[in-house]
Amino acid sequence: LSDRSAVKMGHILGEFFWMLIPNRRKKLALRNIFRGNITKDVKTAEEISKAAAVRFGTIGMSVFRFPLLNKKNISDYVVIQGKEKLDEILASGEGCIIAGNHCGNWELEGAALALYGYPILAVGMKQSNEGFDKFIREYRSIPGQTVEYKTGVRDMLRRLKEGYFVGLLCDQDPGDTGLISPFLGQKTL
């Protein structure tokens, strides 16, 4: 598939899966949009919630295309602003923590960093579906990321000392270990 066809196919897949999302989940998304005072307009809230869900189709298609990415073509897809700072950290050999969230195409971000030559440790959560877990771990490793499940602080410190750029997505549900913090006017975990 061409890039354009892959994006279109991803959007179609996202639209299809949107139809399968239970109405209670869609209503929950609307309530959260209203609670966060993002909009008061029902139609706008519906558009936001649908777009947020449909984009997963495009993200999924980009993961399927990881085998096509390489060091020569990655700059056609991702350009890093502030790359000189990352280069300084890489040259120091000290490693760093890259804190991100599930915004944009986080899967492509990690792949791009690895293809740009940064030693990426993608820290993720084990997926409940064993087959999907195996797939996502394998595909994340194709562009050169090292993938590990959530580990302890000592393990991350060891990886930092080894010079890894430790990627953490900070908007994940921390379970019992999280801190309650304000977000969009609400107390959240």
Where do the model's predicted regions map?
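Membrane-anchoring hydrophobic helices of lipid-metabolizing enzymes
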Residues: 1-100, 134-139, 144
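Soluble catalytic domains of membrane acyltransferases
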Residues: 64-189
